[in-house]
Swiss-Prot record:
Summary of subunit composition and partner proteins: May form oligomeric structures.
Residue span of the annotated presequence: 1-31
Protein name: 23.6 kDa heat shock protein, mitochondrial
Name of the gene: HSP23.6
Gene3D superfamilies listed in its UniProt record: 2.60.40.790
Length: 210
């Protein structure tokens, strides 16, 4: 009897660690290519518009807009963001947990797709035109913002600085990514991404009917 009990304890102790290891969740990571960036900055443009120029930047990962820009964190496609907005409108509880009022009124960001273009609006209170940078990394629109926290008053490089980064994927066969326009005014960033007409798309081929 004693030997059977000891054998049972030995078997249970050898099996338990393996079962716990099976339940351990897997960790995945995703890297983004930031070579040959086409970026929008404030050089050579009057007013609040953002002009286009080319540069190369080192690979860098920043914090996402966890408060006002969560729908685009991490990188999402346009269709995913539009589907997410549909869910917000249909589910008031989900809207409230993602920075939208229970009535469905959007707060902090908005995105609309029309026949001619995709219209994106992001509220960035406390940030100026010089604090915001837009870039195209391959087919991904990257929005970065950096500004000082007035409450902390820290110097550059200290914890008083706020840094934000968020991304949205743009298919180059649907949108004219070389004609993106951006405007920053009164703490609101507006981005217009023109769409290609059907006859301009090289992935659409008309088939002749005999």
């Amino acid at each position: 009897m004693a030997s059977a009990l000891a054998l049972k304890r030995l078997l249970s102790s050898s099996i338990a660690p393996r079962s716990r290891s099976v339940l351990r969740p897997a960790v995945s990571s995703r890297l983004f290519n930031t070579n040959a960036v086409r970026s929008y900055d404030d050089d050579g443009e009057n007013g609040d518009g953002v002009d286009l120029y080319r540069r190369s930047v080192p690979r860098r990962r920043g914090d996402f807009f966890s408060d006002v820009f969560d729908p685009f964190s991490p990188t999402r496609s346009v269709s995913q963001v539009l589907n997410l907005m549909d869910q917000f409108m249909e589910n008031p509880l989900l809207s409230a947990t993602r920075g939208m009022g229970a009535s469905g009124a959007r707060r902090g960001w908005d995105i609309k797709e029309k026949d001619d273009a995709l219209y994106l609006r992001i509220d960035m209170p406390g940030l100026s035109r010089e604090d915001v940078k837009l870039a195209l990394e391959q087919d991904t629109l990257v929005i970065r913002g950096e500004g000082k926290n007035e409450e902390d008053g820290g110097e550059e490089g200290e914890s008083g600085n706020r840094r934000f980064t968020s991304r949205i994927g743009l298919p180059d066969k649907i949108y004219k990514i070389d004609e993106i326009k951006a405007e920053m005014k009164n703490g609101v960033l507006k981005v217009v991404i023109p769409k290609m007409k059907e006859q301009e798309r090289n992935d659409v081929r008309q088939i002749e009917i005999n």
